[in-house]
Structure formats: C-alpha cells, structure tokens
Amino acid sequence: MKYKIVTAFFLVVLGLYSCKSVNKNQAASPRIRPLVDTVGFAHLPWQMDALMTRFRETGWKENHAANPWKTVICPHDDYTYTGAIYPELLENVKAATVLLIGVAHKAAQLKIEDSLVFETYGAWKGPWKNVRISAAREEIYRLLKGKYAMLSDTLQRVEHSLEALIPFLQYFNRNVEIVPVIVPAMSPERMKECGKALAEALRNVVADHNWTWGKDFAIVATTDAVHYGNEDWGGSDRARFGCDSEGNEKALMLEHEIIDNCLKGDITPEKIRLFSSYTLDKDDYHVYKWTWCGRYSVPVALYTSYFLATQGHLSGELVDYSTSITRFHVPVDDLRMGRTAIATPCHWVGYAALGYR
C-alpha cells in the first residue's frame, strides 16, 4: 500500500545513504533513523493518543492477559485501514526488548537477497522519544555476519514495515528497545537456515543476559496479507478470482485456508513449508504465487521461534483478520494523516494478526 510514496522517497534517498560497518557507526555520533511514512502512520504523541481513543470507541477491548506473547505476526498498513488490529495484538507484547523481523520491499532494487539485513543506527524515531537500539543487536549480528547476515542502512532507511509497529510498541512501553531486521528474497531452504541460525544466536544472547522469552524479549514479525485486485497495482493483475463480490469472497476463503493450515496452532517446519508453497512460485521463489509481502519474513520468524523453543511447540492464535474494505475506516484526516493507497473492491489488502505462546 505504500508503493507510490515510498518508491519516490526511495529514489531521493538512495544516493544519500550507504552501508556502514558497526565499528564506523560506533566511532561517529549516534544517528537517528528517520521516518519514511508520516501519512499512513502516526508519528506524534497527540496523534497516537487520539487514535487510541478512536480505536476504543470502535469497540476494541484492551488485552490484559497474564500470559504475554512470545512471537507475533502483525500487519503494517495505514492505520485508517487496519484500525485497532495493532493494539489488539501488540498490547500483549510485554517484553522490554523486541526483535523486529520485517519485509524488505526494496531489496531487489539494491540487488540484496539471501541474507538477514541489519542496520547501524543509534536509535529510531518514535512518537514520544527516540527508540533505543538494544545492545543485543551487535551481539546477534556478530554471531551471524558473513554467512547469514549483512548490514545495509540504505535498505533499512527506505523500508516502512517495521516503522509501522514502533508507535504502538512505544505507546504500551515508553522504554522499549528494538533489534530491527528485515528479510529479502531467499529460497525456502535458505529461510530455514537463516531462521535456525538466528535462533542459535538468540539463544546465546538470551543466556548471556539471563532473559526469559515473552517477559524480557519477544519476536514481532510483520506482513500484510494478500494484496488483491486489478486496479492501481502498478499494472499488475492480482485478482486471481476476479474482483466482484464472488471473486473477493473466494479470495477471503483462500486467506483463511492459509491462516488455518499454516499459521494457527503449533509451529512446525511442515506448516512453514506449506506457507511458502501458497505464497511462492514453485519454479522461482522471487515470484509471488499469492501476494503476502511477508512471504520471506514470516517463515524466517516462525523458523526462529520453532528452533528457539526448547520445551514443546509454540501455538498460534488468530487475534483478528480484516481487510482494507471490510473494516471501518478510522477517521485520520483531522490528525494530519491520510492514506497511501486506495481501498476498493478491486484494490484491497488483508490483515492477519496472530500471537504465539
């Protein structure tokens, strides 16, 4: 949903930022990762306060569960379209340190693939204050660099998916710290390798800090679900079933089939591979089969969670599912916000929110 705005922004900043080593970054004064999208997402405290009031007025019930999420899958689209799905899910992320696993929408333009992508910023901008980068970032990266991970501030700088989550994480915890990672194109086998390696790195770091999963650290992955229709998708026809009422209903049925078969219940390698079979072309993993933008981030996050779980499987619950044309559009124009794309029966996006524990 961000293609028009973010693509133009990407072209402007591409020449201004380059990959830098962790050592060089430490020698310089801390750099703040600036914002990509100030239209679809809130970036000021009063915007967030107003939005949360409006979400509650739509019937959202606050989640005070005693058992926090260890891993979640959250959308990253315009707040007016997603409504309360963000706080419904993220309020129950209680950890002080959050490993963010996001989409790398612009990776192909930079010819980046096959590696987890870290960054070297000193902090990220948040509505109330800058969001600190956890010291765990350097520790995790040190264990992964070369074979499984690389640095690219250029790619991280133009990516919007993780940015969408920060205002809500900071709303519920003003002192939250983050480790931002984005996932470009990679084969299903490579996703498994990277997820397993990330789990091993996390296990070492968690042991060093004496952290408890869910209490001290959590994994927050992001994807929007299907990007559907044949209108204003850059010339692409993504309406597999057509975009009349019958076609859209068939698309929703497939969405729930994917969620039920792959994402709900215990995390297993078989379910993760099945998710890839739904979303990736069998002959070329670079090509969409069903247009979930997190077709790489979700498997990596689930493999990481699977291999990190030492006692039993994590089990996933569907907290909510909606789309940009079925959910009430929360008013945002008076908040100096808006929308980055249209929402019509021939151009809509699905939103799946799942929590694991």
Predicted regions and their residues:
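Long, Lys/Arg- and hydrophobic-enriched amphipathic alpha-helices
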Residues: 307-357
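Sec-dependent N-terminal signal peptides
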Residues: 5-14
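Generic marker of residues within folded, mature protein domains
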Residues: 9, 209-211, 344-346
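N-terminal secretory signal peptides that target proteins for export/translocation
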Residues: 1-2
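Active-site histidine-anchored catalytic micro-motif
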Residues: 22-299, 303, 307, 312, ...
